[in-house]
Amino acid sequence: MSVNIAKPIIIQIKDTRDELDFFETVSLPAEDEKTQEIIMNFPTVYIHNWQDSGDFEVYVGESNDIFKRTRQHYDAALDKKRWQSKLLEKDARLFIIGHEHFNKSLTLDIENRLMHYMMSVDRVKHVHNLRDNPQTSYYPMEELDEIFSKIWRGLRKENKELFPTESKIKDSAIYKASPLHKLTKDQEKARNLIIQKVFMAMENGEKQLIFIDGEAGTGKTVLNSSTFYELYCLAEESNKELSCHILKLSKHK
């Protein structure tokens, strides 16, 4: 990978409407023109975070207009049933992340990987958005890994508790079994078929037993976690009641 990839722009502010207004009207105009251009006119990724009983809760998002999107979150904070209400109750912080190579597809993949990582952080007890949206082929997809690592290292400089080392993340059991791993085409095909069968059985009031068979190392654990996670999300979106039980049988010694 080229060593010429620029560092990301990472800005941390207090997560309040007044601080956002100050950043937009005072702090940002004082930055160099390139920084202003990237934050104002490029897609950005953002992380709302706050502490509750010592541990962190986070919301990760991406937007083509960070100021409009953040104000929408503040408007939603008046509803006590929504996660945004925590922004009024807690000493929340907001990270705004920009890069000169960001486009919609790249920011979606960065957002997805940030959620993936945050799920695996010991000090994070709740990630409030967990619907992944992995991208396929786009430019500059080949820069994703390096840009993300630069972002993570930059975030770690701001808060080492919230952002542990990448090696620690990747060694965790939660990360290895995360439902947000990008699936292969065969895994995605199998997942979609299982979900189709499950919802058909639910609609018809039937019972069904589904087996996933495969050798060790073929991705059964990731397929399982991804399938159950997607089932949960779809059921929640359609207001369907769903309880899941996993029976894992192993022939490997």
PLM features: what roles do these ranges have?
Residues 108, 113-168:
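Interdomain "pre-motor" coupling segment immediately N-terminal to P-loop NTPase/helicase cores
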Residues 179-208:
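N-terminal pre-P-loop "Q-motif" helix
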Residues 212-214:
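Hydrophobic anchor at the beta1->P-loop junction of P-loop NTPases
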Residues 223, 227:
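Hydrophobic positions on the alpha1 helix immediately C-terminal to the Walker A/P-loop
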